[in-house]
């Protein structure tokens, strides 16, 4: 009596070991049967065995035929018992043979793993299992999926399970009423993969005959498909709108500093893109310091990088204005050539210090991931934050220009330079501060762009032309015009891309702006200033 439980446990372990050994069968049909038998056991030990088989980590030892899970460490293969998961030694590559699987067997293993993980205490595993079972609907999974659905309490996982169960019930082996009810269930899921599933019911062969024989099922599927496609078109427009606003926010960040230097001061600063680049490299340096000295605070690195990038690029802008620009006011060609040469110098300087290759700038944890909405719409967190950041920068700049003494003096110099000087305003200092402000804002743009683009010496070149287009289109010297221009060009670009492609779309936008400024030379929102008066 005392020994009987021990004998029972030994017998169970022995039978499980025999079932694992059955995976060594030569035929794939026999292997598939062994996988199904293991899945029926439903014990915790089964999942790592099937995962090892799927990932190519299940081997047999040549001298005794024992099945083992193998982990490679350098040139040594560590051996683990598949049932107990204990290390039993090591071997060379010549002493073991991998268990082979084909695509059909992989599908069976994934389906079996899906059934095993449906009842897992881990919500992420249950969610993943429901997704796998939807991709590979099998009548064998219907009962366990229905049981899992009854006990599931998480709303999102219940929705996934209901979708997977409806996909199984849609199969031709079910009664017509069950299939029609499954279509009604699937109609609520406005997703491309559901559309593909229903579209398969309406496929015709070469003779014109439908794959789906029942006319009622086809009619219901057609109505559900039309409803899903109309909603998907709407969601597609909304997603394009988001990407247009995202591109517009990037253009706004890159152009808003140029709107100050070019729009307000009338200075053609071809080195503006390099001020953006300096901000991006400042972000890289800050993150490297955090990684080295304060790895636990990496999530705060961008918060530190924003004011530092503003200071670095702003100081560089002040040096440029005092050293070069102030001697070239009223000479636009010389200013353009001087700043273009400066941009080449800054690029080469960065190549010398940091090297010509791209530098890695990481994203903090709160900017990683995305909002997954219905209809397959995915809104990345980093782009959402950049949209909010660009609007915040615009509002702060507007407040500075309208409600501070510096802003009042800057507007006075812009509207009537000689009168402002006569009133005691030091116009030279205002020029210096204004140019520094514009370059500092460009540096903050570099912080944001480092989360989207490669940080390299050529980073700024990709945005300088677009920035000038935004400023000219929106209206020289008007920040609201820059905002409207950036968002308009971002939306136009994204709505043109599906039809004309990215490159041809930009060409169309450029032609549109050229034609537009023939009609309105001062842009959408005209503003009088030094550049206009001259």
What does each model-identified segment do?
Residues 10-238:
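Extended repeat-based scaffolds of very large eukaryotic assembly and lipid-transport proteins
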Residues 241-286, 319, 323-334, 473-476:
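Single transmembrane alpha-helix segments in multi-pass membrane proteins
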Residues 338, 357-358, 365, 415-418, ...:
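Cytosolic-side transmembrane-helix boundaries in multi-pass membrane proteins
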Residues 274-278, 328-351, 390, 459-472, ...:
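Pore- or pathway-lining transmembrane helices of multi-pass membrane proteins that form conduits
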Residues 302-303, 307, 432-447, 451-513:
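Transmembrane alpha-helical segments in multi-pass inner-membrane proteins
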């Amino acid at each position: 009596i005392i020994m009987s439980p021990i004998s029972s446990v030994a017998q169970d372990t022995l039978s499980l070991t025999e079932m694992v050994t059955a995976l060594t069968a030569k035929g794939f049909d026999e292997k598939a049967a062994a996988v199904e038998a293991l899945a029926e056991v439903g014990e915790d030990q089964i999942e790592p065995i099937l995962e090892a088989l799927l990932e190519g980590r299940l081997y047999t030892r040549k001298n005794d035929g024992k099945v083992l899970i193998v982990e490679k460490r350098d040139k040594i293969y560590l051996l683990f018992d598949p049932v107990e998961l204990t290390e039993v030694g090591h071997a060379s590559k010549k002493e073991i043979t991998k268990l082979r699987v084909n695509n059909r067997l992989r599908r069976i293993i994934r389906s079996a793993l899906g059934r095993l993980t449906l009842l897992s205490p881990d919500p992420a595993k249950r969610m993943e299992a429901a997704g796998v079972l939807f991709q590979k609907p099998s009548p064998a999974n219907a009962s366990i999926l229905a049981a899992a659905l009854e006990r599931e309490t998480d709303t999102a996982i219940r929705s996934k399970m209901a979708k997977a169960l409806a996909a199984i019930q849609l199969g031709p082996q079910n009664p017509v009423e069950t299939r029609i009810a499954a279509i009604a269930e699937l109609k609520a899921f406005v997703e491309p993969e559901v559309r593909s599933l229903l579209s398969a019911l309406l496929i015709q062969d070469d003779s014109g005959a439908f794959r789906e024989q029942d006319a009622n099922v086809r009619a219901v599927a057609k109505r559900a498909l039309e409803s899903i496609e109309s909603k998907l078109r709407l969601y597609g427009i909304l997603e394009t709108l988001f990407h247009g606003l995202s591109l517009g926010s990037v253009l706004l960040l890159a152009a808003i500093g140029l709107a100050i230097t070019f729009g307000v001061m009338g200075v053609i600063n071809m080195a503006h893109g390099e001020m953006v680049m300096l901000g991006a490299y400042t972000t890289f340096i800050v993150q490297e310091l955090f990684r080295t000295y304060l790895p636990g605070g990496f999530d705060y690195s961008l918060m530190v990088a924003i004011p530092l990038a503003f200071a670095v690029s702003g100081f560089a802008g002040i040096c440029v204005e005092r050293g070069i620009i102030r001697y070239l006011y009223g000479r636009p060609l010389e200013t353009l050539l001087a700043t273009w040469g400066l941009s080449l110098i800054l690029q080469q300087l960065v190549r010398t210090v940091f090297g010509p290759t791209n530098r890695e700038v990481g994203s903090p944890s709160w900017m990683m991931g995305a909002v997954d909405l219905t209809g397959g719409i995915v809104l990345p967190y980093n782009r959402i934050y950049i949209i909010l950041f660009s609007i915040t920068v615009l509002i702060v700049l507007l407040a500075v220009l309208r409600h501070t003494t510096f802003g009042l003096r800057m507007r006075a110099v812009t509207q009537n330079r000689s009168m402002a000087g006569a009133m005691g305003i030091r116009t030279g200092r205002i020029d210096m501060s204004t140019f520094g402000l514009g370059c500092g804002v460009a540096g903050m743009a570099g912080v944001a762009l480092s989360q989207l683009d490669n940080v390299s010496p050529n980073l700024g070149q990709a945005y300088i032309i677009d920035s000038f287009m935004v400023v000219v289109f929106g209206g020289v010297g008007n920040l609201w015009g820059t905002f409207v221009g950036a968002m308009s060009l971002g939306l136009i670009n994204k709505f043109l891309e599906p039809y004309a492609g990215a490159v041809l779309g930009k060409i169309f936008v450029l032609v549109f702006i050229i034609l537009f400024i023939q009609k309105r030379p001062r842009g959408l929102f005209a503003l009088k200033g030094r550049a206009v008066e001259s």
